[in-house]
Amino acid sequence: RDFCLSRGLGDVYKRQCVSKQNSAMIEEMLAYNREFVKNEGYKEYITNKYPDKKIAILSCMDTRLTALLPAALGIKNGDVKMIKNAGGVISHPFGSVIRSLLVAIFELGVEEIMVIAHSDCGACHMHSEEMLEKMKARGINADYIHMMSFCGVDFHSWLDGFEDTEKSVRGTVDFIVHHPLIPSDVKVHGFIIDSTTGELTRIV
């Protein structure tokens, strides 16, 4: 299976190219960055790698939460370890989210985990078939999709969203609590944050 995937993905990588020309938006960010460093804007953000509050937060990558979530919780740079993905969920028992949580716990001193989903989440009601069609429309070769399916990739479980946000939070918390590599003394909490007001509702 690994050989099958590596052969197929190798072909994918061959047809990809890295853009050496920045878009106007990237240029704007780079210009801002130069001024930020020149004016020593970084000084107020200096901290170390250890989270002061000993908390890791798993949340969604939704743009509405970028500034809202920290502001609503009163957290600043250096307070917590923030892990984000689409939906704030765990899709694999040994994937990047669990790996990040293990690093946070065993290497960085995290003692509590907060799973924070949000209202009106884009991952809710997301369907793999629709996304696969969008991939094909953007030029992804259907043969790659078929090859990956043949090699064991379950696109439905990987790309499908969830129907019930509260149920998703409960499932994610349960997944973490019962994971064999997560210590039993680590406290795990589940919440839903309002994407507009920032109000937090405890689920677990």
Where are the language model's segments positioned?
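Single conserved hydrophobic/aromatic residue that forms the stacking wall/gate
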Residues: 1-16
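Divalent-metal-activated hydrolytic enzyme cores
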Residues: 17-53, 88-95, 105-108, 123-204
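Short hydrophobic segments within beta-strands
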Residues: 58-60, 116, 191
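Divalent metal-coordination and catalytic microenvironments
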Residues: 33, 57, 83, 115, ...
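Gly/Ser/Thr-rich loops at beta-strand to alpha-helix junctions
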Residues: 61-64, 119-123
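Conserved beta-strand-loop surface patch within small alpha/beta domains used
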Residues: 39, 43-98
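Ordered, amphipathic secondary-structure segments that act as subunit-interaction surfaces
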Residues: 106-118
